[in-house]
Amino acid sequence: MKKLFGTDGVRGVANVYPMTTEMAMQLGRAAAYIFKSSSKRRHRIVIGKDTRLSGYMLENAMVAGICSMGVDVLLVGPLPTPGIANITSSMRADAGVVISASHNPFQDNGIKFFSADGFKLPDQIELKIEKLIESNKIDSLRPTASEVGKAFRIDDAAGRYIVFLKNTFPTEMDLSGMKIVLDCANGAAYRVAPAVFEELGAEVICLGVSPNGTNINADCGSLYPQVISEAVKKHRADIGIALDGDADRVIVCDEFGHEVDGDHIMAICATDMLRRKLLKKKTLVTTVMSNMGLDIAMRAAGGKIVKTAVGDRYVVEEMRKGGYNLGGEQSGHMIFLDSNTTGDGILSALQLLAVMRRTEKPLSELSEVMIALPQVLVNTRVREKKDITTIPEIAARIRDVEEKLGNEGRVLIRYSGTEPLLRVMLEGKDTYEITAWANEIIDLVRKHLGEKQ
């Protein structure tokens, strides 16, 4: 059972356990030990980060830990998470490290790893790293003299990633004549994303491109789609694109300012790939959080859906296991496995823009491929993550609601993998009813598991 690693690496408040410099150094040492093979060549690990103030101290601690084990470090600076995955594989490094807490506020930070092929580490490798740290087994391993590692800065990392992204866009197309509102959340994509869309010919109105270390995700980015919505209407743009702090997810809005979430983007791209016979096994991989409307849209187009637990890592695992090439989450994580190994907000936006260009249809019209069932999501903070089915009062209320919904809706209860939160999601035909039921369930959760005041 992993203790340090959650569903997306190690995460917490910066400078508070486990997100301390001491732990970052230990993670660096343990990871370096595991990724070193028996070969005599020098080993290299890529380290990138987002724009958080705490990124500097954690980066330096990781560098110290890795170099102390005789492994070199390639520093790429602020770069989107998928860019770090891409650089890791393209530079034939042994592993990649991302220092980011994604969509969380600036006070938080996180550390996650990619293996040499650019995919997130499997659970068993993360468990090995944890056990090494707990056992103190490698404390005595101290390379000396010329055996210690050194750090290099890769100055053209952003440029390499920009070229990679542009090459995923159809060569016979460009974005000339399109007006795009782009919100980079004052995060890792603040330089890369504007360059990609501008170099493809679009007129880009940029928001969230002035990071100062404390404004990442602050009233901007994919968690605040109303920002691009207002800007699209003001500038009469064709589309609004909002990334999160590490740019592994994207939310967009159409030319009228209406939000288009990950489910709709997947529906648009998957049905387009079905038409062009490019969707492997005619299958889209999603999570249990995706709206039932997506299932209906895929069936109508002649495709099918495979569902996983929540978390893009589980989507990717299912895609690799089943031989599928498109998957994602309602939150905006989308994986185009023919192009990249992990969720990529900029790449996903480019694929959506390609469908708009190919069909010569506005986003509002393309979005009609899917009609979402009313969905309500309510969160509450909890003091412990106890199995809900063991609390009779809550379990009975959930069963009662499920009986009332029948085959025309569903109840989904799950804990966040990265925060002390419980999420209650209901789908059904009547928004008023499902909202009331969701609030009833959440009130019972607060009664039994809520944080003590």
From Swiss-Prot:
GO cellular component assignments: cytosol
A single BP term in Gene Ontology: UDP-N-acetylglucosamine biosynthetic process
Co-factor(s): Mg(2+)
Statement: the UniProt record of this protein carries the keyword Glycoprotein: no
Source organism, top-level taxon: Bacteria
GO molecular function: magnesium ion binding; phosphoglucosamine mutase activity; phosphomannomutase activity
InterPro entries for the chain: A-D-PHexomutase_a/b/a-I, A-D-PHexomutase_a/b/a-I/II/III, A-D-PHexomutase_a/b/a-II, A-D-PHexomutase_a/b/a-III, A-D-PHexomutase_C, A-D-PHexomutase_C_sf, A-D-PHexomutase_CS, Alpha-D-phosphohexomutase_SF
Catalytic site: S102 (phosphoserine intermediate)
Cofactor notes: Binds 1 Mg(2+) ion per subunit.
EC number annotated for this UniProt entry: 5.4.2.10
Keyword Cell membrane: no
Binding locations of Mg(2+): S102, D244, D246, D248
UniProt-listed Gene3D superfamilies: Alpha-D-Glucose-1,6-Bisphosphate, subunit A, domain 3, Alpha-D-phosphohexomutase, C-terminal domain
Class of enzymatic activity (EC top level): isomerase
Catalytic activity, as annotated: alpha-D-glucosamine 1-phosphate = D-glucosamine 6-phosphate
Keyword tags: Isomerase, Magnesium, Metal-binding, Phosphoprotein
PTM comment text: Activated by phosphorylation.
Residues modified as Phosphoserine: S102
Family: Belongs to the phosphohexose mutase family.
Biological function: Catalyzes the conversion of glucosamine-6-phosphate to glucosamine-1-phosphate.
Protein name: Phosphoglucosamine mutase
